[in-house]
Amino acid sequence: MELAKSFDPADIEAFWRTEWEKRGYYTATTDADKPAFSIQLPPPNVTGTLHLGHGFNQTIMDGLTRYHRMRGFNTAWIPGTDHAGIATQIVVERQLDAQKITRHDLGREKFVEKVWEWKEKSGSTITGQIRRLGASPDWSREYFTMDEPRSKTVTEVFVRLVEQGLIYRGKRLVNWDPVLGTAVSDLEVVSEEEDGQMWNIRYPLADGSSYKFPIAFDEAGNATEWEERNFIVVATTRPETMLGDVAVAVDPTDTRYQHLVGKLLTLPLCERTIPIIADDYVDKEFGTGCVKITPAHDFNDYAVGQRHNLDKISILTLDAKINENAPAAYQGLDRFAARKQIVADLDAQGLLELVKPHKLMVPRGDRTNTVIEPMLTDQWFVAMSKPAPEGTYFPGKSITEVALEKVANGEIKMLPENWTNTYNQWLNNIQDWCISRQLWWGHQIPAWYDSEGKVYVARNEDEAKAKATAAGYNGPLTRDEDVLDTWFSSALVPFSTLGWPEETPDFKTFLPSSVLVTGFDIIFFWVARMVMMTTHFTGKVPFKTVYVHGLIRDSSGQKMSKSKGNTLDPIDLIDGINVDELVAKRTVGLMNPKQAASIEKSTRKEFPAGISAYGTDALRFTMASYASLGRNINFDLSRCEGYRNFCNKLWNATRFVLMNCEGHDCGFRDAPCAAGDCDPGGYTDFSQADRWIVSKLQRTEADIAKGFADYRFDNIAASLYQFIWDEYCDWYLEVAKVQIQTGTEAQQRATRRTLLRVLETILRLAHPVIPFITEALWQTVAPLTGYKPNPAGDSIMLQPYPEAQAGKIDEQAENWMAELKAMTDACRNLRGEMQLSPALRVPLIMEASDPTQAARLQSFAPYLQALAKLSEVNVADKLPESPAPVSIVGTAKLMLKVEIDVAAERERLSKEIARLDGEITKANSKLGNESFVARAPAQVVAQEKERVANFSATLNKLREQFAKL
């Protein structure tokens, strides 16, 4: 089959991604005779579209899957999508809003129907995009976290945890989004520094007494001046929450206030008194050293309140208005309107001492951008530190303890290992997990209430009624309206996708999975919870290795986000996009539409011509090249261009091989002799160069095997690039041209055999990283190599993955080739030094010290003539007397036989020597300047030293040439 003149990825990708799936090549088996390799796709939001982070981790996962599939493993890469409670509900609510309808107008049942309709229409968008990336999961196992099998598992797990006393309902402080009207997880809260204010407010002593407050100190820190006060000053960034204050805390070691601990204060604007308490939480150096304690509206205050048994007074409604627990003057006001009124009233009463600008971290909802409120609400929680009861896999240990043990004892390995510390730190400081959400879309909590509020947790309503009847209640039951946190169902994925609670063949074969590929930002939210739930319900760990990768940032190191307008869609990198379409994508749906103009400006500046189409393989190779363990990635589009060129290079190399091999005897007769086994003049006669490329191939195969074992895709990509581009294309193909043009028939057969065998092996080696181009090329190359059709199917992805054979490493051939390379480089350098036109072919003379060396040098002659563009190559006992420069390689001397205008050459060399002298003097002057060396970055100083060394080496060569003239 003739290859097209240039590599056009679009048609190849469209054909093969359909063909592979249609032929069933992705489908996993549970063959007991094969080792298992399984991997879970972190389920993307069903609402979502791909971003570069998906492109990155799916390149890694697919590379691992294809590699193990080719090595004969039962490979199960299990795909799925997440119902994404909040995200999905928001999308559908926005659609209704455009029709001037709210979800409350529809009612819960109709609204949920609408969400399912939307999911069925658009839920395949992201899986279609995953296919575009060349991903090869077993689509027959695709799941949705709210499909029937997963819902059944979620209910079963919830009921069992309640029965075991590990899920409870209670009133605790949670992150509350007042726009969405629900609790949200920490991951859905974005805290960024903003400009705010600090208000200093006077809280009067309730008994009207006064005390001496130090206002001046000597050098030793002793007070020297005091003033009489009948109040203390509290500093706060949220004056509206003072309506819920229940105490003021001071540092127990703070001598300014020690004597006041236990006294009562009058809470301004409220007819209440609150105590002064001592607590280590207070930093006496910050603000005034007095902290208002509002347990119902601050997480730290909540902890202080628990320690001191303080009341919790909630002063906000669920939509963030002042409620009935506050003075009537503020009831019904929005929290920020209340803030203004409270500050004005404090000022009017002479209680506002100071207002000053203050930078503070403000928590906002990632989807609504509203300020998140710590809110005291009734929620369901998983007990993270409570010992599990008898009858569970690890009785007497909490699910957190077990999760820590499984990493500590090595059953789960974290890569890089430093993430183990982060994992441990999070789990050692864990709080009970709030798992309820006040949404309509999600797994509705399987709990029913009787008329007196007693709860019955059950697998279905009939079971709940039976439990109520057994408890002596026969009235109506009302189901809990809350749904479960999306992370709850996600935490069950390792076993909910394998048939649990039944011990199915899948469950036995693929749990634990081999590796989890994930970003560090969800180690706690997802990874740790999967460990907890899987160990608790199956006794097994969910995975053996956790490969933690960094975040993908833009080329300047900025985090990619919609609000910054710097996100990149991997499909746009595959297909290309013009600048107008790119601007439109980046500016639609912004939370702050005012950002659109600046985003458009920066986008047009960075991509004036839009983004070129690079194809999937180039994008995947780029991702692999970035995949060093753990580091954040500054994504540079120019790398995609470089790796598109790499794909073109591989395509063109294959065309060259096919043009030189098709229709010829390529050395593949029955039972041909292996490389190196045939005598000269036999059927095949392998050269040193043939042996060299085969030897280098073995080393590359070994390096790549190590890269896969260590999850170092950056090393895999580097090994592939270096061998394919540098060794095979730049050197061996050029050598092969010489052998085909000048060799005997046996040498030509050996060359063609080597060209094809090495190329076919290259394609199999590179397939896990660049699947499309390797499949397309393999289909044309394999038939020429004597390939026998595979009963399982004729695809590269079903071929065995290459393994290094130590017996084929040939150090003698490697040394020979290293010498040829050095001589070629020497000739090219001589041409450069003499400023010869690339088109000018000149003779080369090489001096040999003895007949053995002469024979060896003669073996290089035909190659040097072609590689260095020489008219002829001669070996002599001694070089002729000539002003021409000489290069020494080992013990051999090389000279280009060229007539030289001595006067002109002396003048040229004089000018160049003077220039280099000047550069060295200038650089040494910098390095001799103590101020420069002290202030300049170490890298700049090192570069300057390197310049001096390079200039000096060149200068010495030029002076030698000048002396000869």
Curated annotation (Swiss-Prot):
ValRS has two distinct active sites: one for aminoacylation and one for editing. The misactivated threonine is translocated from the active site to the editing site. The C-terminal coiled-coil domain is crucial for aminoacylation activity. GO terms for cellular component: cytosol. Monomer. It is found in: Cytoplasm. Pfam families: Anticodon_1 (PF08264), tRNA-synt_1 (PF00133), Val_tRNA-synt_C (PF10458). Its EC number is 6.1.1.9. The keyword Coiled coil applies. The gene is valS. Its main location: cytoplasm. Catalyzes the attachment of valine to tRNA(Val). As ValRS can inadvertently accommodate and process structurally similar amino acids such as threonine, to avoid such errors, it has a 'posttransfer' editing activity that hydrolyzes mischarged Thr-tRNA(Val) in a tRNA-dependent manner. Belongs to the class-I aminoacyl-tRNA synthetase family. ValS type 1 subfamily. It comes from the Bacteria. A motif ('HIGH' region) lies at residues 44-54. Transmembrane segments: none annotated. A motif ('KMSKS' region) lies at residues 559-563. This is Valine--tRNA ligase. It catalyses: tRNA(Val) + L-valine + ATP = L-valyl-tRNA(Val) + AMP + diphosphate.
